[in-house]
Amino acid sequence: MRHFTKVIPTITASIQAGAAFADEDILFDWHKVDGFKGSEINGITAIVRGTNGADQTMVDFELLFATSGIKEDTRGVSVDVAPPSLGTVNAGVSTYQWKNNLTGHFLFDVDVEGKKFNDGDLDVLNIATTSGLNIPVGQDLYIAAITKGALDFRSTVQVGTETATNTTAVVVKTTGALLNFAPGDVLHDENDLVIGTVKSVTDDTNIVLAENCASVSAVNKDLYNIHPVQFILSSTD
């Protein structure tokens, strides 16, 4: 039986707002994948949001896979520990205690058929799908990513009217909400204040949340979807 698992790592709003990602930067640190079924990953679809509503000029990026179960009969090793951090997101790898947690990797290569992203037909995001993989999965699964060039998630969608915690309405300005956001997006402002989950986008200046706004965010604060990169993993029993 074939299974599909959606993976939604978080890249905090303040990290996205700070600067574009550069070659060899950590895109996101270890994210535990819940609900994965199967003993190996056979295929991966990657969905990458654009820069302020416009699709990215895509670059290569590398996915790393790991497990907390470090077990080797040869050396008599049996340790259960989640993979330690790679380092600071939006900077290079700087810590290295994850070495024995690794189980595999995959490189999305913009120059290779079957590994590269679409050419911008979707306007606001880029997508790539690859298959024929056999990345082993241990007792659990973690995923992290390193970019091989510039990826930019910076936004100029700004709070137009100070948000209020007694309403689901969010008014924005400067850049269109229809281009940048969609139902299901989780919004934070540039200082990582939680705004809420988008229920609908009425027009370029009006967003409706699933629940009342979680925080009071000031006028002119930039808003971010904290899940600009998502993956769908395919596997078989």
Residue ranges of model-derived segments:
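Extracellular and analogous surface-interaction loops
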Residues: 27-38, 129-135, 174-177
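Extended, solvent-exposed segments with strong compositional bias
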Residues: 85-133
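C-terminal interaction-tip segments
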Residues: 1-18, 132-157, 224-237
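Viral structural modules
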Residues: 1-33, 183-191, 197-198, 208-211, ...
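Beta-rich globular "head" domains
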Residues: 27-67, 181-186
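Surface-exposed turn/loop modules enriched in turn-prone residues
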Residues: 49-105
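Autoprocessing Asn-cyclization modules and mimics
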Residues: 154-222
